[in-house]
Amino acid sequence: MAKQPTRARKRVRKQVADGVAHIHASFNNTIVTITDRQGNALAWATAGGSGFRGSRKSTPFAAQVAAERCGEMAKEYGLKNLEVMVKGPGPGRESTVRALNAAGFRITNIVDATPIPHNGCRPPKKRRV
């Protein structure tokens, strides 16, 4: 007997009113992840994944483009309010927050969660150009 074709169910996106934008700004790249309050990832984007390669990945503009892409994906969940957590010393810290604000999100608060070592690992040697 022939198998009946099963219909692929359309995945229903859950509606989330407010979430958390995690920004990881390193010296080489910027990663933007938008999660719900429980920490489940809704959308993410990187400067490298946005078409920037090499040293252009580590620019504020690349971080801005990554934030805009991530914001567009997060809008599908009906997100309105964002809490921003910034981590890292990279050049895309401020431009990412500005881009999320310009994308139409209401930013409730900004937290700097940069890990500071209590004399942990030895830092990289100074550059000689």
Swiss-Prot record:
GO molecular function, one term: rRNA binding
KW Chloroplast (keyword) present: no
GO biological process: translation
Role noted for this protein: Located on the platform of the 30S subunit, it bridges several disparate RNA helices of the 16S rRNA. Forms part of the Shine-Dalgarno cleft in the 70S ribosome.
Similarity annotation: Belongs to the universal ribosomal protein uS11 family.
Subunit composition and interactions: Part of the 30S ribosomal subunit. Interacts with proteins S7 and S18. Binds to IF-3.
The name this protein goes by in its record: Small ribosomal subunit protein uS11
Source taxonomy: Bacteria, Pseudomonadati, Pseudomonadota, Gammaproteobacteria, Vibrionales
Gene (UniProt): rpsK
